[in-house]
UniProtKB/Swiss-Prot annotation:
Regulation: In the absence of viral infection, maintained as a monomer in an autoinhibited state. Phosphorylation by TBK1 and IKBKE disrupts this autoinhibition leading to the liberation of the DNA-binding and dimerization activities and its nuclear localization where it can activate type I IFN and ISG genes. Phosphorylation and activation follow the following steps: innate adapter proteins, such as MAVS, STING1 or TICAM1, are first activated by viral RNA, cytosolic DNA and bacterial lipopolysaccharide (LPS), respectively, leading to activation of the kinases TBK1 and IKBKE.
Disulfide pairings: 263-285
Assembly: Monomer. Homodimer; phosphorylation-induced. Interacts (when phosphorylated) with CREBBP. Interacts with MAVS (via phosphorylated pLxIS motif). Interacts with TICAM1 (via phosphorylated pLxIS motif). Interacts with STING1 (via phosphorylated pLxIS motif). Interacts with IKBKE and TBK1. Interacts with TICAM2. Interacts with RBCK1. Interacts with HERC5. Interacts with DDX3X; the interaction allows the phosphorylation and activation of IRF3 by IKBKE. Interacts with TRIM21 and ULK1, in the presence of TRIM21; this interaction leads to IRF3 degradation by autophagy.
Post-translational modification: Constitutively phosphorylated on many Ser/Thr residues. Activated following phosphorylation by TBK1 and IKBKE. Innate adapter proteins, such as MAVS, STING1 or TICAM1, are first activated by viral RNA, cytosolic DNA, and bacterial lipopolysaccharide (LPS), respectively, leading to activation of the kinases TBK1 and IKBKE. These kinases then phosphorylate the adapter proteins on the pLxIS motif, leading to recruitment of IRF3, thereby licensing IRF3 for phosphorylation by TBK1.
Provenance organism: Bos taurus
SUPFAM superfamilies, per the entry: SMAD/FHA domain, Winged helix' DNA-binding domain
Region of interest (Disordered), residue spans: 111-134, 147-170
Organism phylogeny: Eukaryota, Metazoa, Chordata, Craniata, Vertebrata
Family label: Belongs to the IRF family.
Protein name: Interferon regulatory factor 3
Amino acid sequence: MGTQKPRILPWLISQLDRGELEGVAWLGESRTRFRIPWKHGLRQDAQQEDFGIFQAWAVASGAYTPGKDKPDLPTWKRNFRSALNRKEVLRLAEDHSKDSQDPHKIYEFVNSGVRDIPEPDTSQDNGRHNTSDTQEDTLEKLLSDMDLSPGGPSNLTMASEKPPQFLQSPDSDIPALCPNSGLSENPLKQLLANEEDWEFEVTAFYRGCQVFQQTVFCPGGLRLVGSEAGDRMLPGQPIRLPDPATSLTDKSVTDYVQRVLSCLGGGLALWRAGQWLCAQRLGHCHVYWAIGEELLPSCGHKPDGEVPKDREGGVFNLGPFITDLITFIEGSRRSPLYTLWFCVGQSWPQDQPWIKRLVMVKVVPMCLRVLVDIARQGGASSLENTVDLHISNSDPLSLTPDQYMACLQDLAEDMDF
């Protein structure tokens, strides 16, 4: 027998009716519109009471226990916003979150009668609550307790189910400036800019022997192909894997590798969509992927997923990476992984040495390597001269440790989880 978690709408209505939280209030006698303070956490004038509604929901939902858990303002705000955004009876009427004097948002019930939802009994779970309520509670708990590991589900359909609306969303929390950092703007936000291209280091191995390495900027993404021609009509810059006959001496192995390359067809496509890296196979041979160390893939266990055919699949999410990087700097975990490994034409080497596989390809997003290096060295200003972020059109980076942390936290609030 446990305590039932409150539902967001009845709980929020009760908070509005009480009027005890600073800035949280009904607008007008009809009580269909209300305002929520929405001050950025890095503003110099930010006070604890500015985030009262977010903390109160974190406590009520069981995501935060005062005195036990570490306060996490960005996560509280994201969870609260996500809970509201999932409600079809609510809409964001006005966004004044960039107002320098009074940052806030105004929400509106699209059905005037919905605000009369009764507050559920939260004393003892008597097992008689509505099935839909149970599903809602379970979903919200899964979302709040989710382990945001970098390896997202391989069957994510990014293009149709999760478009990168967070890039220039009107509901974005990030202001034009990066407060408390002494910077006029956050240079790390270039990572999400539509017009910016990431630089990738691509390395290919045939039976464990490195046969190819190239560092490229690829507008529209890249495609690993096995022939010179490929299909020029497909998007992404084709990167041809080398003829195995030029580097392998075993003829039987050479023949097998050539067979795999011939089945690549249109290639293995990899591109960035906002905070995601997406992949799709355009040929017949299966491709499995996993996040691992730069020096070797994560063998000994199953792959993180299989690259889907004829649709997009998410293979890397920048959001959890940034969150884990912040936690690493705080000393609470190891540095996050960022290297993508692909096993082409064969099953993932979970029970065998990876060097036994015919074709393995490693892809390193150079900007993520730089971010981890900065964290390990205690700030970009601690490295020699300035740091290249390895993004097209980006300026050299030089940040103190405090500036770097502030920019990471600022960037994290721009993420969609």
